[in-house]
Amino acid sequence: IEPMMHNGVALQGGTSHYFGDGFAKAFGITFTDRENRIRNPYQTSWGLSTRSIGAIIMTHGDDNGLILPPTVAPIQVVIIPVAQHKEGVLEEAGEIAATLKANYRVKLDDSEQSTGWKFSQYEMKGVPVRLEIGPRDIEEGNCVLVSRVTREKKIVPIANVEAEVGAMLKQVH
């Protein structure tokens, strides 16, 4: 099976190999058949799993990295505190994370990396939704959602963040 990827490249989708009884003999693998005779089994090998991962990467990506469907993304929403050293930012980000974790796979990145580095890192990893929150957002009662697919930013009220994240994730296939 060799499905064609969107860029015209064929990907070997699955393989099967018939090994006969050679490996069974070499490793002393035996069984007793219905007539009570000792036999060596005939063996086969089948492969698909790692090729499936390759197909996802080839199909769901662009020049900036992966674009993972929410169903397979290990992280569905990354929360990036902007100016996290400012009072209240990490606390608000943590509260949003706790709310979203009830229904989504969420990561709150409170590392010391720069905000730009974090944006790039999670875009490359294919995280479907990025949530940005900083002091000005908190003051206004909002946060910013960014879609990995469209790269569009949407300012949403913190009170509606769970519904807005759900709607954004549904737009990604």
Enumerate the predicted regions with their spans:
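NTP/phosphate- and nucleic-acid-binding module
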Residues: 1-173
